[in-house]
C-alpha cells in the first residue's frame, strides 16, 4: 500500500465559524471545515430556536440558515426557513378534533417572497364550512401582516408564536370566534424569493465554484 502519494486533504481544511443573521445577534451556529471558502457558499445549517435564544420553550422550532458569504474565518448566513418538529405537531393532534392547515405564498414590504404554513387545532371536531372559514382568516392575517412587515419582522411574527401580536396569536384571536381552538401554530416557512436588481429572484444561493467554467 503506497502511503507517500496519498494526499491528506483533511489537513488542508480550515475551520470556519458559521453565524446567524443580525436578527439573531449573529449567534454562532457552529463550525465547519472546508479547504476552500467558496465551498461553504450555499451550505445549509440546521439548529433550533432554543439553541439560538437559550429559551427551552423553543426547543421544538427547527431553524434553517444558508451561507451566503464568507469573510475571513466567518461564514455569514441568511434565513432559509423554519419548521416545527413532527413529534411536536403529532402531540397537538387529538382524536375527535380537527386540524386546519393553510399554505400561503406571501410577500413582505421589502420584497421577499415566502411560503407560510399555518395550522389550527380545534377543541372538538368542526364542520367543513368552519374549517374553510378558519382557513380564510389565516390567509387574511398572514398576507396582511406580511405586506406590512419587513422580512426580519415577519420571521419574528412566525417563530415567536407565544408572543402577543405574533401570527399565531392573531389567528387564534380571530378564528376562535368561528370555532373554539386549542392551539394555533405557524408550522413551517420557506424563503422562495429575494429582491434583485431587476426584480424578485429565486432564493437560490450558488457557489462561485459552480460558476467557474471547467
From Swiss-Prot:
Keywords for the protein's UniProt record, in alphabetical order: Ribonucleoprotein, Ribosomal protein
MF (Gene Ontology): structural constituent of ribosome
Pfam families in alphabetical order: Ribosomal_S3Ae
One cellular component (GO) term of this entry: ribosome
UniProt record, GO biological process: translation
InterPro entries: Ribosomal_eS1, Ribosomal_eS1_arc, Ribosomal_eS1_CS
Family from the record: Belongs to the eukaryotic ribosomal protein eS1 family.
Protein's name in the database: Small ribosomal subunit protein eS1
Source organism per UniProt: Aeropyrum pernix (strain ATCC 700893 / DSM 11879 / JCM 9820 / NBRC 100138 / K1)
Gene that this polypeptide is encoded by: rps3ae
